[in-house]
């Protein structure tokens, strides 16, 4: 069993949380505040934090093995650049052993890959259309691969 942090835990994140909980993992899902009840209904622990303010996520990393950074469809360039880079820099001093990055933005994927190499934290990139039927299964498989690394 591992603890997985899902940032943010929107609709796709909650589907992933349900599957990870069913597999026996502890899951913590972040929200800016609007989806606390929906996250709790998945069996995940809700955590109020903002990916635009990395400092608000630091306490959520306690005991976390895998971070799922699911910002691929959010049209905020900073989440795929400065904030993403800052997250990786902060992960060095945590128990995190892997990151799943939703790689819809080429610049963000490049930062994630470079950061993975620099900080020696394994990375799995989810690419392709997140609306496809296999997205959740692909995300679960990415988490499983990181846990096996």
Predicted regions and their residues:
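Glycine-rich phosphate/pyrophosphate-binding loop and the adjoining helix
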Residues: 129-149
